[in-house]
Amino acid sequence: RKTKVTGSTHCYDSGSIWTENDKEWTVIIPSDEGPQPLGSGGEIVRWVSKNEGKSWKRVGTITSGSERNHGYVRRPLNANEGFYAYWSDGNPDTLSPSRLYFYTKDGQVFQMPYDMSEEWCKPIPYCTEKKK
């Protein structure tokens, strides 16, 4: 069975799927256009199906107004709710910095420090998911 979750602006826009229980599935993907609209990535959005993927509803905008496109959202295996998804950003049109982000199940987004002077550093609060 094929079901369309959403569309995107680039064939390399990729995200991940979570199966919360037998019926509820979550997809987190860069499905909104980002600041570099012709390149891979964009703004990160959360989509949920409560009927095993038969239909999908946009439930939250995780990033918006970003400087660089976000992409390659990944689902950590056996992770806790404080580390629910992670991804990076970058400008696909030119050589640029790339930062790492992670998302908590309750909708908080954190950015990892770009420069680390010690082995351990605190993540930087980045934004909060806007629920739809």
Which ranges hold each PLM region?
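Extracellular, repeat-based ectodomains that mediate carbohydrate processing or recognition
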Residues: 1-132
